[in-house]
């Protein structure tokens, strides 16, 4: 029988789970709860004694030392009077009040950093007589020093504080190893900013990373960023197969852990390139799961930090360090270009700066060099670990010249930019067999998509020219310009659909989304095109791409979404009476993309190399006039002179043989006012830049 004076242990209660508490919704306290089960996320139950409420908070009760549930113990000497006990209580209440005010002010976006630093210093000024060493260390760990470069003031951690449970996904060795393997399969081939062998020795074999000390903040941030990027690249099927959990739960945990590690790494003032690598991976991963403007805003920090670390320079560095710096800088340039297109807005890095600093890394495999490499290594021919990334670097350089260079309004200059881009990128496909590996297949089709995109950008650039501008407008492609432009846009949309339907593209689907520019071109060309056969082929592709874009980027630029929605409504309204017998144009918002692949002309498996030249869907079979044109235009990057690709034609796949001498812009006639195709694109760009245009709308005529 218990003694009368002995305190009874407070029973453990089943409280609201973590997710319901954060979302501030009522939890039924089941295991798992109904809210988490319906949302498809992992339910984290909370079981602990209930905290005192109301008047009970004011009472000082001595907690039994053997009580394992006790989290705070305050001992008042028996010899002390009532006044001493009251003084201790008042002092503790004051510290709690100041700590709560500090937390509330940190959540406010308008808080002052200096005031927070002073408050945090005041709170942790504790004497040994007041709290023991363990309590003091707990306060020090819970204090966030914003003056040291913490990112909580930027809102990376969301509305709630950090939870120790979120970092367990990184500390779990088995999970981190699996996520690293996913990263090496899905992310590393397309975002090449890390040295693959060094990452394998570090995360898979347990060695130190590039000479850093154990538990270095920069290395911890990089490991968390790798796990976060890997989590976002998973498909739902892969997530269940590997982790027996939904993708959303894995991504949420990995993101919290990554943001916590970035806060501890002092990103804003850190001199380590590794910390910036972690932040860039964070931006890449967040951009794939979060269509809001967050990444577009945070890109300014990445660009500033890169310039502060002198990434474009670094001539005195070792060969290994030079390669890593070049990869990181050009990846930042690529992200800057991609985020500027998604809003749309001007890139942070100007065309002149991106061109002058364009120094691509070596086209080699990661196994060809290491941290101890003391000499340069020559470029390799054929497919390497860096082939796709090298093409991406050239894409952002050419894309800036075609879309954001104000002086490039002459058709010959634009033609030269496209030709130089094709020469540089197609050279990287020497001996590439698309049937060898999923990476080779993906690189093969994406490069064709990039070449088509460059040609489309030359014909329909993003530069907005108001009427009355002194610049020369782009001439029509040819007498059947609308059909040719529509074919270019359709090819891009089909290639995107191919990646999302072919099993070999499963690991890279996170990286490929429907680009709004080709989609807008395709919709506007469907409105003005007179070829009914081409329209019948195009509409299912356009409809599927529109629904996929609408579902994937909800929450992104309102101007883009509104413009595409308006264009699609006008096309459906105009073409429904004439094509209702062959295709339905009244698709509901729940349009199923899975029903579309049967109508696409893109094959799900690439043709054999013996029959590849007979495929009518390939770019090499498209009619492109080829009048003579001088090749003395400016280089894309003015960094290295590329040898003419015609000198090595015997090394190219037959698919690419006809691309050497093809021209993008043909026809010498000036643009006529009745060119409905160009007028339609002008209205699209005007709607993006000016909102609702006040000019006469041809889509309403």
Curated annotation (Swiss-Prot):
Domain of life: Eukaryota
Any Gene Ontology CC annotation: nucleus
GO MF annotation list: DNA binding; DNA-binding transcription factor activity, RNA polymerase II-specific; zinc ion binding
Annotated GO biological process: DNA-templated transcription
UniProt main location, coarse: nucleus
Gene: nscR
Species of the source: Arthroderma gypseum (strain ATCC MYA-4604 / CBS 118893) (Microsporum gypseum)
UniProt entry keywords in alphabetical sequence: DNA-binding, Metal-binding, Nucleus, Transcription, Transcription regulation, Zinc
Summary of the function given for this chain in its UniProt record: Transcription factor that specifically regulates the neosartoricin B biosynthesis gene cluster.
Record keyword Cytoplasm present: no
PROSITE patterns from the UniProt entry: ZN2_CY6_FUNGAL_1 (PS00463), ZN2_CY6_FUNGAL_2 (PS50048)
Localisation: Nucleus
The keyword Metal-binding appears for this protein: yes
Annotated protein name in UniProt: C6 finger domain transcription factor nscR
